[in-house]
């Protein structure tokens, strides 16, 4: 109830000229008059309206200048709509940023807030680029994709799941194909359903997989040959991850409540870490050979220094159900997903939740989680992909998969569908996300 008056006081105290907040406030009141362009500048009323005579040149059907203004107007209108939709969220973002700097005359934090404004309005929609199918039998509904990962150069991506197959596709070929009939460059058959895959960041073509029998397998993805197998887990293995610093090191987590550390140079595990409950996911800090995060069925995220595994460095508490995924946004921030239908943002130096993300539905399945460092993508049990910006709690974009039905199910309503988005992967250095659902449909999507 007191957020808006406090926000107004901050605006009056700290800003004597047109500022980020004034533009934001004016946009909400009169979206035709102002808009944020770049860092704290404004677009005047006469320039924002392409129909204004002073901004148009004579000529058949308007000029190039007029066309550019029309395009600019439509773009800004889209951004205005998103700012208005997330206005309360932006207030909270502003307050949390500014209150960290208690000096009355300080302008610290404004740059971060400006960057948040710019980044969260960067994309307005999701555009499909290509469609693939993981299913071996189009009549078989059990073709859940459990994991999608790009290789170290973002040239190839692998898809794995319950059909026991790992399919490797060349990204450039998939995008360039005119028709949506795509063939993998290689295909590997496993002995059990696959839960997770991870590419080596050093050896081109080296891929690790974990499966429902508890086996961790190292593959040469281009020859399709098994390089090594590790079989120490006693139950289903949910997650596997290559270390980006020590490129011979691999971690795996299992229902046997153990995290195993492997070296591709050794035949047996080099470290065995005992957890308090089933381990659903493991992820190395991308800048460290020693630091590992794991998500557990006891609702917690644990952060370990592998040089001393007796106690975790930090335990992140806040989820109400099992933690299914953990991903690092950067070297200090990580995001977790849980079957409590929430994502949570954490900082390794602080034990409390930085932000919760709500909007998607996730109560029982692994639905995928990916990030490019600023945006977070996750699946949902309503057969949709959700995109969040790390500075805001509500989703900024959503893409719904089509429901494919057989003859017996054609009269079912879409909301009665049991399909869910099951795997998500970000193509790093780009705005491309690859997502798959429980029917085995894979979409290559671009944020625009």
Segments (PLM) and residue ranges:
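Intrinsically disordered terminal extensions that flank WD40 beta-propeller domains
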Residues: 1-142
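Beta-propeller domains
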Residues: 104-137, 157-187, 222
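WD40/WD-repeat beta-propeller blade N-cap
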Residues: 135-143, 187-194, 231-237, 273-279, ...
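WD40/WD-repeat beta-propeller blade-loop signature
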Residues: 144, 153, 184, 193, ...
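Loop/turn segments within WD40 beta-propeller blades
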Residues: 149-154, 197-204, 210, 223, ...
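Conserved strand-to-loop turn within each blade of WD40 beta-propeller repeats
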Residues: 160-163, 209-213, 252-256, 264, ...
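WD40-repeat beta-propellers
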Residues: 166-172, 197, 216-220, 240, ...
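Structured C-terminal portions of repeat-based eukaryotic scaffold domains
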Residues: 307-436, 443-448
